[in-house]
């Protein structure tokens, strides 16, 4: 409604018309209201609303829709009545008390119907404003909008709205309201197809806009895509052409990361990038799309480099803040606990991105080497080295403070392990100094180290191929943790891990060390191996895979060098049954190597050579081998 400096003298005259008995008077009064009543003058608007009443407004709207009758109306006035009705309803809804009333809430289905039939009409913007204001004013309003299939109407119109328009802005705000009130799981069960369309439209806004609405789009995309309930939607989105919405999100992420924006928005961009990589894989970071859109094709590595650089910065900042909260800030306060929890969640996102980039770097040379040149690889390795150095400093700080338990520490070990699996010589001295500590780290739900060892196994397997690596492992003080890890992987405890290769990595690591025991001067009491021998016996009894049995027998043969039958039987919970199982395993593998030429000859030689060295200390094995 247009403001006017001479409102007061005209208001009383307007109210008299609105209270008149004839529709002509009320119509004239409403027209006057649109001329002089200020939209922010809530007091006057309340008086006007009370004077005209909701019944007449409802009848006016229905007449404009062709469903009702105004006594003075003519058919050719329907558009005028509709425009007037929507205008005054939109204006009245600016008063929260009016907007939250049931009389306004019941108009939502009618306004949605107007939108569906008047998509190009001048009243459309006021329809959107009415819906937003009434939905904001009360929960009943928001639920009526949702239950009246408001999302379906939004989805049908958003793709035709002008980029960055006020209608797009209102649509985004409406969707934010809905997501705060209704779970994404419920929404996607009812409106999966519509939600897919909406995400694609919002992704375009995120790409092309350069104002505050860009960040509203970013937040909305994160609210949808980073939700744990978004699995159905993610599946549906992957059926859409990636050249459109996925590319738009990449463009938007790059724009945020390479411009001067608030740190919080950069973090939001990283969260969105992590969601996209979870959907499309690491290649999303380097996928180059030719497009006729206003966005020029960018170098394939730009998004990758920007995401890694910002992740490195976030990790450095967040780990510094986490260290302060853990070791210096006042403890046992709600504010410290909340800040710590939030920053730890953010670190998880940055860690996840770096770990995915490490995976990409390890695969890209083989699969898409032409997309990343030598200069890009150099930049990536430099940034990864800097990132790993920062994480190692965080672990060193934790070690100095006597901290070994925590999911943040375990996540740090995981990312170190991921990188060292590809570059085992990176940060060599620091890794050597911290190896024992990293092997001792426990997650918050662990009673003893396990996952930290699993994360480091690829690196351990590589470094123990050389004597120096074996010495580093033997001297770090946590060799028992590696032995226990294999025991838990193959024993009756039934530990499970994502990567089944952990078993063979652990086997190879232990074999590498035992084979070099003389050069390493490894002196261990046989009791150290008792649990592992029991696990090897259990493994051999529960597998038909000959390669697994050969591996188990080889490790057993190497362990037997350190002990004897008598010493083992003196160990707690180590009995004749376990020893008999191990003897049967060795006997079977010796027989297999004689009969099967395809048997791994290296392992066969380890078993037979071991047997010749220690058979005299294990008298009962001769019964199994039948010598």
List the model feature ranges, each with a label.
Residues 85-87, 127, 347-354, 412-414, ...:
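Well-ordered alpha-helical segments within folded domains of soluble proteins
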Residues 267, 277-401:
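Alpha-helical repeat/alpha-solenoid scaffolds of the HEAT/ARM/MIF4G superfamily
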Residues 558-561, 606:
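Oxyanion-binding "anion nests"
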């Amino acid at each position: 409604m247009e403001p006017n400096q001479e409102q007061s003298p005209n208001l009383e005259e307007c109210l008299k018309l609105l209270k008149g008995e004839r529709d002509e008077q009320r119509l004239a009064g409403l027209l006057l209201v649109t001329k002089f009543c200020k939209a922010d003058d809530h007091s006057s608007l309340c008086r006007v609303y009370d004077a005209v009443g909701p019944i007449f407004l409802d009848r006016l709207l229905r007449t404009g829709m062709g469903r009702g009758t105004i006594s003075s109306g003519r058919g050719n006035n329907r558009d005028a009545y509709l425009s007037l009705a929507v205008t005054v309803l939109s204006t009245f809804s600016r008063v929260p008390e009016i907007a939250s009333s049931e009389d306004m809430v019941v108009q939502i289905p009618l306004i949605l119907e107007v939108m569906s039939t008047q998509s190009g009409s001048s009243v459309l913007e006021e329809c959107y404003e009415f819906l937003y204001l009434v939905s904001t004013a009360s929960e009943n309003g928001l639920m009526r909008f949702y239950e009246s299939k408001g999302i379906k109407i939004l989805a049908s119109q958003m793709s035709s709205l002008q980029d960055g328009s006020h209608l797009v802005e209102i649509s985004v705000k409406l969707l934010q309201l809905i997501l705060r009130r209704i779970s994404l799981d419920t929404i996607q069960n009812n409106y999966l197809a519509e939600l897919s369309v909406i995400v694609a439209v919002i992704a375009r806004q995120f790409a092309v806009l350069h104002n505050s609405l860009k960040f509203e789009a970013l937040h909305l995309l994160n609210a949808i895509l980073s939700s744990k309930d978004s699995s159905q939607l993610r599946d549906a989105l992957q059926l859409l052409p990636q050249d459109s919405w996925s590319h738009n999100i990449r463009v938007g992420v790059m724009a945020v990361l390479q411009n001067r924006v608030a740190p919080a928005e950069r973090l939001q961009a990283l969260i969105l990038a992590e969601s996209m990589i979870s959907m499309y894989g690491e290649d999303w970071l380097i996928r180059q799309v030719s497009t006729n859109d206003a966005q020029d094709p960018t170098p394939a590595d730009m998004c990758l480099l920007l995401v890694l650089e910002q992740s490195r910065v976030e990790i450095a900042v967040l780990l510094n803040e986490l260290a302060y909260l853990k070791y210096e800030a006042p403890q046992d306060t709600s504010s410290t606990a909340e800040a710590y929890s939030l920053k730890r969640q953010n670190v998880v996102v940055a860690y996840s991105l770096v770990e995915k980039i490490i995976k990409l770097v390890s695969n890209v040379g083989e699969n898409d080497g032409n997309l990343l040149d030598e200069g890009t690889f150099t930049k990536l390795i430099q940034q990864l080295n800097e990132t790993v150095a920062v994480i190692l400093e965080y672990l060193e700080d934790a070690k100095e403070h006597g901290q070994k338990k925590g999911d943040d520490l375990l996540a740090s070990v995981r990312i170190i392990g991921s990188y060292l699996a590809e570059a085992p010589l990176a940060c060599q001295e620091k890794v050597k100094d911290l190896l024992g500590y990293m092997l001792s780290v426990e997650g918050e739900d662990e009673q003893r180290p396990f996952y930290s060892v699993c994360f480091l196994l690829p690196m351990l397997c590589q470094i123990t191929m050389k004597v120096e690596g074996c010495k580093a492992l033997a001297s770090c003080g946590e060799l028992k943790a590696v032995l226990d890890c294999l025991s838990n992987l193959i024993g009756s405890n039934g530990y499970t891990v994502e990567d089944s290769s952990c078993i063979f990595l652990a086997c190879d690591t232990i074999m590498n060390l035992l084979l070099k025991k003389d050069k390493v001067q490894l002196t261990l009491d046989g009791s150290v191996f008792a649990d592992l021998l029991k696990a090897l016996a259990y493994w051999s009894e529960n597998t038909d895979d000959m390669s697994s049995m050969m591996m188990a027998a080889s490790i057993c043969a190497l362990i037997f060098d350190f002990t004897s039958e008598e010493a083992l039987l003196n160990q707690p919970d180590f009995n004749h049954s376990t020893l008999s199982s191990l003897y049967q395993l060795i006997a079977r593998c010796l027989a297999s190597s004689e009969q099967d030429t395809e048997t791994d000859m290296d392992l066969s030689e380890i078993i037979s050579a071991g047997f010749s060295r220690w058979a005299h200390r294990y008298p009962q094995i001769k019964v199994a081998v039948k010598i």
